[in-house]
């Protein structure tokens, strides 16, 4: 792939010596209204990335260590941790290499830097796609466990889970390769945005339906104990709060990135859209933050996993 300047990339470029430079095909010399540009210090970005790496490595180690966690649900959580780990590692690696290039501490031929850029971009894009896929897979798994509880173990078997996991990884690698190869096509950006919207709708529909079932179940229990309102309202408020946090964090962390992609299609040269483009480094930081939060939402709430995690930490000392 030929070098086309510092902003030729879908997910950033090592040809730009500043890690805070606009990415995703931005017009660097746009003129227009005064914009609010929130820069993220390199040290903070690298620090968040390292925190995410440590957290997700611990999740993978805990699930690998405890055989009681070798079930489809925890395998999906483990794969989500691996995806978040790859997002963090690749983003930190890209920023570190760019800083080294800027400082002159890393010298290399343009072809070598170009090849490394290609590899990192495919890794970042594939990890993002797989992370979204496994968030959807976890939602589907929980939905089946609630609405088909008696048949859950016959529906979600280990072979089926492994086939689903393999399909997600293969699809993520292939799609990310195509996305990077055809980064300058509008269809690529539309596919990414459509994929995000589909995952958001899927998760919202499934979790809202699960909340409705939980409230219905609570009403049934309340009638038996003749205290309908307190029990039902308490569970409903708790469930609604949990749902709001889960979907809110997902949308807050991923939404700006895909808004960025949408505006690239709708108004790539409009001055106001250019103001959004200048904050891409912040949007990538939010995705790293999502990788930090995911273990707390999906993994650390399990008492069995927390116990195993303590054992892993004690063994490491």
Swiss-Prot record:
Pfam family, any one: 7tm_1
Positions of transmembrane segments: 38-63, 73-93, 119-140, 164-183, 192-211, 241-266, 280-300
Membrane topology: Multi-pass membrane protein
Keywords: Cell membrane, G-protein coupled receptor, Glycoprotein, Lipoprotein, Membrane, Palmitate, Receptor, Transducer, Transmembrane, Transmembrane helix
Extracellular domain ranges by topology: 1-37, 94-118, 184-191, 267-279
Residues covalently joined to lipid (S-palmitoyl cysteine): 315
InterPro entries reported in the protein's UniProt record: GPCR_Rhodpsn, GPCR_Rhodpsn_7TM, Melcrt_ACTH_rcpt, MSH_rcpt
Gene Ontology terms, MF aspect: melanocyte-stimulating hormone receptor activity
Topology, Cytoplasmic side: 64-72, 141-163, 212-240, 301-317
UniProt main location, coarse: membrane
CC per GO annotation: cytoplasm; plasma membrane
One BP annotation, GO: adenylate cyclase-activating G protein-coupled receptor signaling pathway
Residues annotated as glycosylated: 15, 29
Subunit composition and interactions: Interacts with MGRN1, but does not undergo MGRN1-mediated ubiquitination; this interaction competes with GNAS-binding and thus inhibits agonist-induced cAMP production. Interacts with OPN3; the interaction results in a decrease in MC1R-mediated cAMP signaling and ultimately a decrease in melanin production in melanocytes.
Function: Receptor for MSH (alpha, beta and gamma) and ACTH. The activity of this receptor is mediated by G proteins which activate adenylate cyclase. Mediates melanogenesis, the production of eumelanin (black/brown) and phaeomelanin (red/yellow), via regulation of cAMP signaling in melanocytes.
Protein name in the entry: Melanocyte-stimulating hormone receptor
Organism per entry: Felis catus
Gene responsible for this protein: MC1R
């Amino acid at each position: 792939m030929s070098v086309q300047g510092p902003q030729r990339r879908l997910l950033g470029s090592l040809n730009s010596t500043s890690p805070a430079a606009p990415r995703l095909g931005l017009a660097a010399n746009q003129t227009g209204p005064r914009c609010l540009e929130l820069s993220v210090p390199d040290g903070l970005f690298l620090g968040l990335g390292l925190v995410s790496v440590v957290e997700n490595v611990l999740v993978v180690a805990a699930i690998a260590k405890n055989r009681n966690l070798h079930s489809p649900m925890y395998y999906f959580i483990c794969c989500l941790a691996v995806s978040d780990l790859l997002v963090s590692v690749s983003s930190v690696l890209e920023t570190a290499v760019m800083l080294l290039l800027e400082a002159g501490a890393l010298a290399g031929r343009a072809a070598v830097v170009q090849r490394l850029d290609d590899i990192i971009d495919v890794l970042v894009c594939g990890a993002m796609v797989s992370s979204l896929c496994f968030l959807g897979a976890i939602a589907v798994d929980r939905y089946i466990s609630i609405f088909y509880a008696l048949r859950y173990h016959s529906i979600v078997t280990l072979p089926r889970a492994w086939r689903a996991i393999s399909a997600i990884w293969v699809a993520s690698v292939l799609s990310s390769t195509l996305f990077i190869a055809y980064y300058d096509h509008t269809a690529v950006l539309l596919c990414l945005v459509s994929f995000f919207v589909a995952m958001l709708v899927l998760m919202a529909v499934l979790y809202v339906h699960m909340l409705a079932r939980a409230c219905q179940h609570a009403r049934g229990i309340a009638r038996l104990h003749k205290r309908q309102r307190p029990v039902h309202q308490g569970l409903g408020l708790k469930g609604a709060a949990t749902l709001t946090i889960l979907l809110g964090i997902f949308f807050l962390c991923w939404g700006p990135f895909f808004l960025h992609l949408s505006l690239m299609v709708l108004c790539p040269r409009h001055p106001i859209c250019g103001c959004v483009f200048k904050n891409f480094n912040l949007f990538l930081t939010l995705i790293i933050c999502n990788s930090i939060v995911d273990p707390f939402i999906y993994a650390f709430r399990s008492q069995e996993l927390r116990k195993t995690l303590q054992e892993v930490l004690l063994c490491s000392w």
